[in-house]
Structure formats: structure tokens, C-alpha cells
Amino acid sequence: MSDAAVPPKKASPKKAAAKKASPKKAAARKTAAKKTAKKPAVRKPAAKKRAAPKKKPAAKKAPKKAVKKAPKKK
């Protein structure tokens, strides 16, 4: 509502950014609210499963490089 009260010159860039971001943010809030309201217990494991595959590749790559370098130095 604050953007609407601002003069058009100042509000135009803010409104454009808000219009672009608002639909995505609103959808994310709605989906998050639905997930938390319907099944909060199921939402946490799902988040962990999603995060695990993303973190594991990076974690695997770094240790492998370190392990390869260590024996060569020794």
C-alpha cells in the first residue's frame, strides 16, 4: 500500500519490481502456509530430503580432492 501513496516517478520502479516479485512471493507464501497448516510433520523430512542431495555432491567433491592431495604430499 505504501507504493501506491508515493508519487508516480518514485513509485514506478518500486511498483515494477513489486509486480514482478509479488506473484512469486505470494505463491510461495500460500504454498508454505498450506504445507505448514496441513502437514507440518511431513514438511520437515521433505525439506531434509531435498537439501541432502544438493549438499552431498558438494561435500563429496571437496573431501575427494583433499584425500587425493594428501597422499601425494605424504
UniProtKB/Swiss-Prot annotation:
UniProt keyword list: Chromosome, DNA-binding, Nucleus
Keyword Iron in record: no
GO biological process terms held by the UniProt record: nucleosome assembly
Domain of life assignment: Eukaryota
Compartment(s): Nucleus; Chromosome
Coiled coil region boundaries: none
Keyword Nucleus applies: yes
Basic residues composition-biased segments: 11-74
Gene Ontology cellular component annotations, sorted alphabetically: nucleosome; nucleus
Region (Disordered): 1-74
Disulfide bonds: none
One MF term in the entry's GO annotations: DNA binding
Name of the protein: Histone H1.C8/H1.M1
The organism of origin for this protein: Trypanosoma cruzi
